[in-house]
Amino acid sequence: MSSNSYEVSIPMSKKLNGIPETTSKDLQTLTEGAVLSFHNICYRVKVKTGFLLCRKTIEKEILANINGVMKPGLNAILGPTGGGKSSLLDILAARKDPHGLSGDVLINGAPRPANFKCNSGYVVQDDVVMGTLTVRENLQFSAALRLPTTMTSYEKNERINKVIQELGLDKVADSKVGTQFIRGVSGGERKRTSIAMELITDPSILFLDEPTTGLDSSTANAVLLLLKRMSKQGRTIIFSIHQPRYSIFKLFDSLTLLASGRLMFHGPAQEALGYFGAIGFRCEPYNNPADFFLDIINGDSSAVVLNREDIGDEANETEEPSKKDTPLIEKLAEFYVNSSFFKETKVELDKFSGDQRRKKLPSYKEVTYATSFCHQLKWISRRSFKNLLGNPQASIAQLIVTVFLGLVIGAIFYDLKNDPAGIQNRAGVLFFLTTNQCFSSVSAVELLVVEKKLFIHEYISGYYRVSSYFFGKLLSDLLPMRMLPSIIFTCITYFLLGLKPKVEAFFIMMLTLMMVAYSASSMALAIAAGQSVVSIATLLMTISFVFMMIFSGLLVNLKTVVPWLSWLQYLSIPRYGYAALQHNEFLGQNFCPGLNVTTNNTCSYAICTGEEFLTNQGIDISPWGLWKNHVALACMIVIFLTIAYLKLLFLKKFS
């Protein structure tokens, strides 16, 4: 079979209703857009296999010598699962880790700028938009952080309104996107909102990772019709897709077929059927071309069987045994390399590359920002506050539980007496207050885990700095959600329990509970940062607090702990909080009825004063004995927050 016979075209003349025909004016517009070319793209990753003692690292080839040109229009990357289409898309969008990556990606013949990922648009497969905000509020956030500060608010609002109108979101512009607790817009409208977030910057190149995933056939078709209209405005739209139906396939301008990291076809989508027909794979009538191509690649198509029967005798006579055993994918890749489509692509690639010879892709991890740190901090804090108010289930539930626990504890330990039983009751209730603050702070793990995908996408796209996001979340979520419950808990329990009737003692207790809550929450952030599953972070937090409780000072007298384990007490958050609360409450108290501490009266009780109790517990009764606990908690807050920030900063943000 000669390679020259591959150049066969089967035009797909029928078109969908509602799609305008391409006019000469459209062609002129398309030629003025951005042309992305990729030259000899190879990508390998190192994979660890085997068990712990027998683990070895092997290098796996993901993409091998991929070449092509993406022009203004709809450029589809099609292939089976694991074929490398998402990897190729991420490489073209400069969102793939450059380790193991080689080749060139050019824009109109020039290297991509270092901040290409910030100037282009990228719509991820899972729609990462804030569900508690309206469509317009999400777009306002994108415009505020991605558009230059030289633009006025009026100009930004005009851009937002234009994008809303262009994507047909007028009717739902002021509706919430929706969460699992809040009813919002439809799946198609949510996908269009994700696209609108990227169109705010008016990019010439738009990347989409499987934009039809999770949508029904009608909604998926509507999304692709929208992309088709956008492509006619001169945009280069590049997207991966798994198994489109026929009406969607007909919209494609360019088709790239990948399998096992090899290029099966790259060229005009309407000529793909003709190409495969020319090499012996005939599509049955009424079969979806996209399904037909995937069947060929997977080797389970009737066309493959017919092809093997037709060329079987010829292969037996002319081919060597090693050639007959060549896998189908290898044969298809070889067919394409010998085809006229590949030769035409090489001519275009040589025109773009010119005489420049580049060895490998540079590391495109640079991220640029259109706004300042303070501007980003303001908008992140504002969005987080709106998210808190728009999703009140968690916050209200936490406040209700706080009030309920405060009343229950107040009823159980109501009006503590200054007698020996009061010593035990005070020690018990102060221990409960401390541990309750710790375990209530476990909810802080969700602060960074739930929004991990949103954070990674927005950071790579140049919305904000890591520092802006981190401090914005602290100001809007962590501080109010830990401070308010501590204030409420103190106000309810302090007077019901009948603790020391001094103003300074009341505020010291409130401060101590806040510090314990902040320390525990900071520890939760340090553990949760970078985690993808809330349950894992919660489990680690719970185990840590259980061990900390042992060294808090109630369950075991810390003076009796063996030296080689006693150092663990200095890592216990409850220990510092519990010691501070005991110092604040017991100092100056008299627990022996009728005992005059100013005289030499004797008493039958082992402990009569608060000082004696504190000394027995190994607590320093000096003023520094109180405040050193707050200093220790403050140091732990700084250390844990630093760990959380560094984990966010060095989080693997590129796939």
UniProtKB/Swiss-Prot annotation:
This is Broad substrate specificity ATP-binding cassette transporter ABCG2. Belongs to the ABC transporter superfamily. ABCG family. Eye pigment precursor importer (TC 3.A.1.204) subfamily. It catalyses: ATP + H2O + xenobioticSide 1 = ADP + phosphate + xenobioticSide 2; urate(in) + ATP + H2O = urate(out) + ADP + phosphate + H(+); indoxyl sulfate(in) + ATP + H2O = indoxyl sulfate(out) + ADP + phosphate + H(+); sphing-4-enine 1-phosphate(in) + ATP + H2O = sphing-4-enine 1-phosphate(out) + ADP + phosphate + H(+). Homodimer; disulfide-linked. The minimal functional unit is a homodimer, but the major oligomeric form in plasma membrane is a homotetramer with possibility of higher order oligomerization up to homododecamers. Residues 1-395, 450-477, 528-535, 652-655 are cytoplasmic. It comes from Bos taurus. One of its GO terms (molecular function) is ATPase-coupled transmembrane transporter activity. Residues 36-285 form the ABC transporter domain. Disulfide bonds join 592-608.
